[in-house]
Amino acid sequence: MSSIIRKRLFFTSGRPLGLILGLSLVLVSGLIPMRGLFGQSTTYLVTELTSGDGAQVPSKLNNLGVIVGRQAGDGKGVPQATFWNHSHSNGKHLGGFAGADYSSATGINDTGEITGSSNTEAAILPFIWTEKGGLQRLPVLPGDTCGQAVAINKHGDIAAYSSGSNGARAFLWSRKGGVRELGTLAGGNYSKAHDLNDSDEVAGVSGSLAGDRAVLWTKDGNAHDLGTLPGDFVSEALAINNAGEVVGYSKGPNGMRAFLWTKSNGMEELGILAGGSSSRALAINDSGTVVGASATQSGDHAFVWKRQTGMLDLNDAASLAHGTVLVDAHAINRKGEILAMGGMDHGGMAPDNHRCAPAPPLSFLLTPTNAP
């Protein structure tokens, strides 16, 4: 990846403590010994992943720290599905279907199998990529004309959805079983998958008689309505871990709220950041750590949530260069590494009528350097 900017952040079991020294193109050694004074802390190393022109857009990472997304790499600004690792720090392009001018990787497992979508002359379609087989087109549901893959598990099974005259429909693809439609809740006319775990449990959203609902499809083929938070009318599940814990958002008269759903406790609200008006949970790892975004008075801020600490603003621990703020955290792996998106703080940029164009988004990798 291009110009690397690294900073150290601290989180205690309570409030974030602040910035550790250093902004450089290389790792700096300045370290303030806060841990002894303030108790157990989590330290993060923050690495800027993007080049500053918006050409690189990381989306997911596996438990080995390999990152997938898309990158404009053909000299014409055409986005291509890409992965980054220690051997390919500048990115390895996966290509696309014949004639494609767009492809994007949206999931990777720990064996390096990657899934995503690429367009053709007629439509966008899902793919699987392997080191041996390269990029291969996946089928969609009968009668559908386009589709997108969203996640892949350790077995190489893929959660996806396709669309046609009957609307969007979630499905699960496997090498042994091919395409299997996941169905909808009673009265629903569409469904979308967003994530799956190693037990082939799929999290997503389905229409229903009561409106859009967060749904969990279990391996037995049943679709389970996860409900909403009290008083709300719609919900959507965005991620699931290997314990079957699901996160997403519920929406009603009081706005959008991040939720965690577990088999034992059902759906519980995760709250909002101080002064905020809404929140949404975007990812969860196998330890139950949740990341996402919460709207505040100064715009969206990325958060991390743990049961022992509650919701913490990632920006309380660091002031990133040039007025940049972390606006959402959208992926987290077993090691606690977090992918976050950055943008310009309102206080760090010119008014709208003084700017020629909005600043391109930035992406960051937050790597814990000690156990929480």
Locations of the language-model features?
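N-terminal secretory signal peptides that target proteins for export/translocation
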Residues: M1-G14
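Residue-level hotspots at or immediately adjacent to binding/recognition sites across diverse folds
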Residues: G14, G18-L19, L25-P372
